[in-house]
UniProtKB/Swiss-Prot annotation:
Family label: Belongs to the pyruvate, phosphate/water dikinase regulatory protein family. PDRP subfamily.
Species: Clostridioides difficile (strain 630)
NCBIfam families hit by this protein: PRK05339.1
Binding-site positions, ADP: 152-159
Disulfide bonds: none
Record GO terms (molecular function): ADP binding; ATP binding; phosphotransferase activity, phosphate group as acceptor; protein serine/threonine kinase activity
Principal EC category: transferase
Protein name: Putative pyruvate, phosphate dikinase regulatory protein
Job of this protein: Bifunctional serine/threonine kinase and phosphorylase involved in the regulation of the pyruvate, phosphate dikinase (PPDK) by catalyzing its phosphorylation/dephosphorylation.
E.C. code: 2.7.11.32, 2.7.4.27
Top-level taxonomic group: Bacteria
Key words, A-Z: Kinase, Nucleotide-binding, Serine/threonine-protein kinase, Transferase
InterPro entries per UniProt: Kinase-pyrophosphorylase, PPDK_reg
Length: 280
């Protein structure tokens, strides 16, 4: 199917520069009058985040170009794209296989091994590891150590935003708001300037959750995607955010980059330390 506005997802378990540059080099071979966009998704080391990225790619009918050295992650991309009819191009596996065949050696399969491990890079890795460790309220102690805390109900982009901000060396913890589960006391022990509330429209949540259930092979009639349940969760989250006194961002129809930009602006306005984005 021909598309007027081509979108390419450059997906990597490292920085993603290779996938992005290859995509740019290929695009330069065409006289493109129409607009196109290359979106880079680095550090795809979390299966859940990777799956969510693939779901977004499907929604945008994007071409996926990826440099993943982890065989399991490669398999996830291949299976998803085959099932959903998406086009994807693996830039590394065939080359690794041929080199292995000719040399008799096995690849290390370490993401980002070519990179220079300088201080800034280690800070970024630390922030990413922090985001993974304290994702989805796994350990409330992370709330006390984080530069910023995201709160919101399921499917309000907490995890992808945490990873995106981590790539700017910002340590982010996110806390899910569920009516049946008490919010960690640590949330009320920190400066509210560090907390950002996330919400979404009921219709969008219903759509996203239904797609999520389908991707997991579950019934779309589950309570998770029920509109009445969603409204209940939204009311609960609104009440909690008012108690906290934090700013709230509606992520409906917003790209991750756009929402992250709003968060960074709020951090600046609140006088919180902002880490300069590292150009790599």
């Amino acid at each position: 199917m021909l598309v007027k506005n081509l979108i390419i997802y450059a997906v990597s378990d490292s920085v993603g520069e290779t996938a992005q540059q290859v995509a740019k080099a290929c695009m330069s071979q065409f006289y493109v009058n129409e607009t196109y966009e290359i979106k880079r998704f680095p550090y795809m080391i979390n299966k859940g985040v990777l799956l969510e990225t693939l779901e977004n790619a499907k929604a945008e009918n994007a071409l996926i170009v990826y440099t993943l050295v982890d065989e399991e992650l490669c398999s996830i991309v291949e299976r998803y794209c085959e099932r959903e009819g998406l086009s994807c191009i693996d830039l590394m596996t065939d080359i690794l296989r041929e080199i292995s065949k000719r040399t008799g050696r096995k690849p290390k399969r370490e993401a980002g091994i070519i990179r220079k491990l300088d201080e800034s890079y280690f800070k970024r890795v630390e922030a990413i590891e922090f985001a993974v460790k304290y994702d989805d309220g796994k350990d409330p102690r992370g709330v006390l150590q984080a530069d910023i805390i995201l709160v919101g109900i399921s499917r309000t982009s907490k995890t992808p935003l945490s990873m995106y901000l981590a790539n700017k060396n910002i340590k982010v913890a996110n806390v899910p708001l569920v009516p049946e589960i008490p919010i960690p006391k640590e949330v009320f022990e920190i400066d509210t300037k560090k907390i950002i509330g996330l919400t979404n429209s009921p219709e969008k949540l219903n759509e996203i959750r239904t797609q999520r259930l389908k991707a997991l092979g579950l019934s779309s009639k589950a309570n998770y995607a029920n509109l009445e349940r969603i409204l209940q969760e939204l009311d609960y989250s609104e009440e909690i955010m008012k108690r906290i006194g934090c700013p709230v961002i509606n992520v409906s129809n917003k790209a991750i980059e756009e929402t992250a930009g709003i968060i960074l602006d709020i951090m600046k306005e609140n006088g919180l330390k902002i880490y300069k984005e590292i150009e790599i």
